[in-house]
UniProtKB/Swiss-Prot annotation:
Entry's Gene Ontology molecular function annotations: ATP binding; guanylate kinase activity; nucleoside monophosphate kinase activity
GO cellular component, one term: cytosol
Sequence positions that bind substrate: 37-51
One Pfam family linked to the record: Guanylate_kin
NADP found in the keyword field: no
Sites bearing N-acetylglycine, chain numbering: G2
Name the UniProt record assigns to this protein: Guanylate kinase
Length: 198
């Protein structure tokens, strides 16, 4: 049957990736493990180091990237983000399906590795809905909002590239989007349960 493949979730900020991911990890906590990314940005209120992100300095992160310790990394809004090999190995060491939350640049980088994950893109029903969601967060300035929306538009265009994603989920209703996500991962969930992660 083979061991379960990792899962790469991508999609614009505000599309609902984190919410879907939280639901998946809550419902199947012994099957899925989240690969915690590194970032050089400051923590937002309520974020914990080692749980939401590993918050590191630019110097440390650049040194580790140069040493080849990262599967993928990207720069956004002046901050570095990336997935370290150690973070993925830590999840796999617990016999869990590793879930990575990465941007499109990250997806392209992972395509060059031997990770062979399932690629899933989560997108909002429209850019208007996305703008509404981002405004409700109250964490964006007008400038950063415009940047995020421009990036989202570009991502949504690129996601149509043949062969880039195995599945595109349009998150117009959380329940429907979550059902589609679980459906897409049902084979991997079965494999994981068969190898004794129940």
């Amino acid at each position: 049957m083979g061991s379960p493949r990792p899962v790469v979730l991508s999609g614009p900020s505000g599309a609902g990736k984190s919410t879907l991911l939280k639901k998946l990890l809550q419902e199947h906590s012994s099957i899925f493990g989240f690969s915690v990314s590194h970032t050089t940005r400051d923590p937002r209120p309520g974020e914990e180091n080692g749980k939401d992100y590993y918050f590191v300095t630019r110097e440390v992160m650049q040194r580790d990237i140069a040493a080849g310790d990262f599967i993928e990394h990207a720069e956004f809004s002046g901050n570095l983000y990336g997935t370290s090999k150690a973070a993925v190995r830590a999840v796999q060491a617990m016999n869990r399906i590793c879930v990575l939350d990465v941007d499109l640049q990250g997806v392209r980088n992972i395509k060059k590795t031997d990770l062979q994950p399932i690629y899933i893109f989560v997108q909002p029903p429209s850019l208007d809905v996305l703008e509404q969601r981002l405004r409700q967060r109250n964490t964006e300035t007008e400038e950063s909002l415009a940047k995020r929306l421009a990036a989202a538009k570009a991502d949504m265009e690129s996601s149509k590239e043949p062969g880039l994603f195995d599945l595109i989920i349009i998150n117009d209703s959380l329940d429907k989007a979550y059902w589609a996500l679980k459906e897409a991962l049902s084979e991997e969930i079965k494999k994981a349960q068969a190898t004794g992660h129940s």
